[in-house]
């Protein structure tokens, strides 16, 4: 993967903040480094976005509909079940696999790239899973309104590597993202990270523990072998074809 990988979000230009550093809606200004849309959507994908996405909403996430940032009612959404979060679900293979394998768990996926959202919806249309909610936007906005200590597990799988050194601050594994994630995870919750980029591994191992996580590894096999419930994604297959080695990192949220 690279900055020019068309299958991942790429840099875009956007309007700047006002003098107070906020949008007109009151939302804090957050740089988004990526595309929201790629190839032209097929008619069935447009239909899925129009028909399915509103039904799968986790609730009022956007600043325009929830300016007071009231917490989402996950109890109403998932009837008391454990809730998991996948940050940047790509084409949705892993999310659908987990939803089908764990019907007693609620899963929220956050993905700003509309083509990826459309791919997930297409898979869900063919799936029996009824335990999924989808936020088609920035995970930071979602984490704003998730209740504290409400999630039992989180996944970050083959995120955009931003390989250039000057772009490393754009990676998810910075405190800007990790501290909000730690806030919404329960003590003891699991955070899984998969990546094929050695420097991303390095930054992950440096930054994630600073946010209150413990790396659960006793030996090399703990990060060389995939998790027992793993399904290989298209991004992983691309990495393997190009000769890169996947790493599977497991962290636990501390008290």
From Swiss-Prot:
Matching Gene3D superfamilies: Vaccinia Virus protein VP39
Organism domain of life: Bacteria
Region described as Disordered: 1-29
Keyword Ribosomal protein: no
E.C. number(s) listed in UniProt: 2.1.1.33
Protein family: Belongs to the class I-like SAM-binding methyltransferase superfamily. TrmB family.
Its job: Catalyzes the formation of N(7)-methylguanine at position 46 (m7G46) in tRNA.
Protein name: tRNA (guanine-N(7)-)-methyltransferase
């Amino acid at each position: 993967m690279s900055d020019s990988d068309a299958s991942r979000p790429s840099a875009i230009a956007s309007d700047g903040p006002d003098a107070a550093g906020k949008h007109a809606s009151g939302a804090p200004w957050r740089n988004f480094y990526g595309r929201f849309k790629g190839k032209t959507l097929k008619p069935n994908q447009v239909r899925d976005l129009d028909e399915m996405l509103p039904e799968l909403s986790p609730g009022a996430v956007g600043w325009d509909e929830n300016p007071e940032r009231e917490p989402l009612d996950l109890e109403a959404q998932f009837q008391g079940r454990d809730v998991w979060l996948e940050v940047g679900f790509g084409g949705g293979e892993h999310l659908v696999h987990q939803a089908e394998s764990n019907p007693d768990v609620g899963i929220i996926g956050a993905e700003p790239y509309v083509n990826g959202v459309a791919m997930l919806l297409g898979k869900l249309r063919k799936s029996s899973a009824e335990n999924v909610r989808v936020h088609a936007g920035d995970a930071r906005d979602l984490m704003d309104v998730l209740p504290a200590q409400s999630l039992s597990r989180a996944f970050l799988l083959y995120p955009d590597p931003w390989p250039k050194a000057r772009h490393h601050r754009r990676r998810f594994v910075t405190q800007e993202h990790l501290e909000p994630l730690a806030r919404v995870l329960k003590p003891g919750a699991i955070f899984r990270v998969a990546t094929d980029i050695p420097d991303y591994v390095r930054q992950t191992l440096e930054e994630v523990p600073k946010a209150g996580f413990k790396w659960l590894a006793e030996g090399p096999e703990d990060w060389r072998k995939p998790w027992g419930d793993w399904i290989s994604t298209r991004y992983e297959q691309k990495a393997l074809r190009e000769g890169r080695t996947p790493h599977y990192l497991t962290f636990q949220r501390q008290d």
